[in-house]
């Protein structure tokens, strides 16, 4: 679950400096901020006015952040919910095999994959 904010009066946009002071009043802001429950900014994307936002990517990032906050994994390029994850390098391989009972595949000593832990 995550809240989505609409900023009809531009108060949040002004607070975070999202609008250039010389911009037109009617120009939409195409910025996305993901702020976690601890009020920490985790992602900021600003799109050109000519480019629409990619909501599939935004949802993918939220899924990744929620997963990696709860498990010692990272998500690789083009990862989708349900795909294998990367075991973080700080966990030794023996400990990783114990921590991830679904299995750990060692592609390289520095690259170990495991099925998504919360599936």
Stretches with model-predicted labels:
Residues 1-119:
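Chalcogenol-based redox active-site neighborhoods
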